[in-house]
UniProtKB/Swiss-Prot annotation:
It comes from Drosophila melanogaster. GO terms for biological process: negative regulation of proteolysis; sexual reproduction; sperm competition. It comes from the Eukaryota. The gene is Acp62F. This is Accessory gland protein Acp62F. Residues 1-24 form the signal peptide.
Length: 115
């Protein structure tokens, strides 16, 4: 089990990676390619629905990756991109919740190196 300090440190590091200063007046998320079926948003949930996870389980209270899928689409973490639920890999077993899902979505943008 992760202690509270580790969780807070992880949350701060995640936000620093997602946002960069634009000037002394505020912050702005980086420009990202959210693929054809996704869109950029300021603070999406950290545990969205994916091919593997329902998105209904408990989740950390912080911003997730900068992209969200359009209605009817879910994240396929293998690509990563938004796909129709029916286009998810057939070998994926759906689960109700994910543990610290934020780190699972760091690659959901072509601006991140995920190799």
């Amino acid at each position: 089990m992760t202690d509270m300090w580790s969780l807070k440190i992880c949350a701060c590091l995640g936000l620093l990676l997602l946002f960069k200063p634009i000037d002394s007046m505020g912050w702005q998320g980086p420009k990202v390619d959210c693929t054809a079926n996704g869109t950029q948003t300021e603070c999406p949930v950290a545990c969205p629905e994916t091919c593997e996870y329902s998105g209904n389980g408990p989740c950390v209270k912080m911003c997730g990756a900068p992209c969200v899928c359009k209605p009817g689409y879910v994240i396929n973490e293998r690509i990563p991109a938004c796909v129709l639920r029916s286009d998810c890999p057939k070998d994926v077993v759906r689960k109700e919740d994910m543990l610290l899902g934020v780190s699972n979505f760091k690659c959901f943008s072509r601006n991140y190196n995920c190799s």
